[in-house]
């Protein structure tokens, strides 16, 4: 049995191509940012939860967003 898929002219051709090209770099930045966040969170955990920060969860989320942006910048520069 021979399976041949010719996707030319299909409306989702660009969507599938775009997802396969543009999703992996963001996923790499997300995963690398998570690793950076784990290290930074471990270093700053005592200060964040000591009461100096008004809302520790928002601080954690902000640090995570900064780490993902930093990881994306590192991946772009590399």
UniProtKB/Swiss-Prot annotation:
Signal peptide start and end residues: none
Keywords: Cell membrane, Membrane, Transmembrane, Transmembrane helix
Annotated membrane topology: Multi-pass membrane protein
Superkingdom of the organism of origin: Bacteria
GO cellular component, one term: plasma membrane
Protein's cellular compartments: Cell membrane
Record-linked InterPro entries: DUF1656 (IPR012451)
Transmembrane domains' residue ranges: 20-40, 57-77
A Pfam cross-reference name: DUF1656
Protein's recorded name: Uncharacterized protein YdhI
The organism's taxonomic lineage, starting at the top: Bacteria, Pseudomonadati, Pseudomonadota, Gammaproteobacteria, Enterobacterales
Gene that this sequence comes from: ydhI
């Amino acid at each position: 049995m021979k399976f041949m898929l010719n996707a030319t002219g299909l409306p989702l051709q660009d969507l599938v191509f775009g997802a396969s090209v543009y999703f992996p770099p963001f996923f790499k930045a997300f995963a690398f940012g998570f690793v950076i966040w784990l290290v930074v969170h471990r270093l700053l955990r005592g200060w964040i939860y000591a009461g100096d920060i008004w809302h520790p969860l928002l601080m954690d989320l902000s640090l995570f967003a900064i780490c993902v942006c930093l990881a994306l910048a590192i991946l772009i520069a590399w």
